[in-house]
């Protein structure tokens, strides 16, 4: 019997790892992921130098990350998108570190003009969740349509007509907006 106790404790210790919960550092970014994709999503943590550490390797194309460290973001700010957009996200983070609003926009405009603006994957979805905390955060979903215009899509470039519309038409930032929260 005395030999059985250490063996039983060892088995329980090993089995406990199989049922362990994710850390808050992983669960927090996954809040923005669609339920049917979250389990298989990759989770990364951005570093100040524009690189990232992989906290959880996923098996689908969705990558999620916390962005509440960026200037002007609320206390709870997480986002998920296609792994194909990581270079775009890195560039966005670089621009977001520019505190002055006018200088920030000028840096983006200059990159658009000189062709160095990284394009997102056409048709990729961006799931963003922002608010003072997770309980009060709101979802915002957009679909990247780099270069899309009203002529190429037939969609308006403003929300006044109702329905879906293209924001930032004709740029690499062009994306489909939908009404609602």
Name each region found by the language model.
Residues 5, 19-20:
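Intrinsically disordered, low-complexity, hydrophilic segments
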Residues 1-8:
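Bacterial N-terminal signal peptides that target proteins for export
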Residues 21-181:
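Primary mode marks residue(s) on the alpha4-beta5-alpha5 output face of response regulator receiver
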Residues 15-17:
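N-terminal signal peptide c-region/cleavage motif recognized by signal peptidases
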């Amino acid at each position: 019997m005395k030999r059985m106790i250490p063996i039983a404790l060892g088995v329980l210790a090993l089995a406990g790892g199989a049922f362990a919960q994710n850390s808050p550092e992983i669960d927090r970014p996954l809040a923005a992921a669609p339920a049917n994709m979250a389990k298989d999503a990759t989770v990364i943590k951005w570093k100040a130098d524009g690189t990232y550490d992989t906290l959880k390797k996923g098996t689908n194309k969705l990558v999620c990350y916390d962005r509440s460290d960026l200037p002007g973001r609320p206390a709870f700010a997480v986002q998920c998108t296609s792994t194909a957009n990581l270079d775009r996200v890195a560039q966005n983070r670089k621009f977001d570190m520019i505190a002055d609003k006018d200088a920030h926009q000028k840096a983006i405009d200059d990159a658009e003009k000189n062709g160095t603006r990284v394009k997102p994957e056409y048709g990729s979805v961006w799931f963003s969740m922002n608010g003072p905390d997770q309980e009060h955060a709101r979802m915002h979903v957009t679909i990247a349509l780099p270069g899309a215009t009203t002529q190429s899509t037939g969609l308006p470039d403003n929300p006044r007509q109702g329905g879906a519309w293209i924001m930032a038409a004709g740029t690499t930032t062009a994306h489909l907006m939908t009404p609602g929260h």
